[in-house]
Amino acid sequence: MPRHPDPQLEQRILDAACRLWGRGGAKSLTMRAVAKTAGTTTPTVYERYRDRDDILRALRQQTRQELFAALTRCQSLGQCCERYLEFALERSHAYEVLFDGVAQPPSLHEPWPSFNLFRERLAQQLGGTPRDHTRLMLALWSLMHGTAMLIIRGRATGALRIQMAYACVDAFETIVAAASTSKGKRHSGPKWPANLILGEGQHSRLNIHHMKGKEKRDQGENGKAGGKTERKTTARR
């Protein structure tokens, strides 16, 4: 009896690869592990993908397309920044794959839809052509990507995660506003407002509720650690 093709198989394989990446990075992503996690056989995976890097390339391409689709629904540059952060934090494993060396991160010499979308929005707001704003967009992207990776990889803990997300959006909008008011003039850069440094942004649209749960867990763990330290200090006394 002929076997019926599974139209969802390739997506299951990519989802499995993403989960495995989240557990242990590239070293945990073997063809056999992908097959087991996807609920299929290793030969079946090889029928669709040559090797691990081929799977990662496919996952990377899909993630780029999904990020672009998410950004196209935004009405303003500020919303684009917010959505970029939200996407990176909601799809953290896929986002890490997108910029990992194994999968070769995008460069200015290959199509990068999301980067080009930002440049087009900058051209609409500031004038000129998208290419004119490549340098500015590199600075803005560095801000967004750096913030996302610091949060994803746990370099920022507790309430600092939320403050960093707000500060990133504030900084993004401040830089764009400074470029808008000074276009055609030479300037030394935007002057940073006090609320940016203090992390008092009011961007209520930013969906960072999923970070608050981890913040509470971190506070609980810090409290336990503090209690242990205090008990040890008391005992030594």
Where are these regions (language model features)?
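C-terminal peripheral helix-coil segments that are non-catalytic and often amphipathic
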Residues: 120-124, 153-237
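Amphipathic alpha-helical packing segments from all-alpha helical-bundle domains
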Residues: 103-139, 162-174
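Short, hydrophobic secondary-structure boundary micro-motifs
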Residues: 30, 96-99, 107, 153, ...
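Generic hydrophobic, amphipathic alpha-helix propensity
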Residues: 9-17, 34, 59-63, 67
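Helix-turn-helix
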Residues: 12, 16-54
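Amphipathic alpha-helical linker/stalk segments
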Residues: 61-80, 109-113, 118-124
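Helical hydrophobic small-molecule/effector-binding pocket
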Residues: 78-100, 104-112, 141
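Amphipathic, non-transmembrane alpha-helical scaffold segments
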Residues: 6, 56, 60, 64, ...
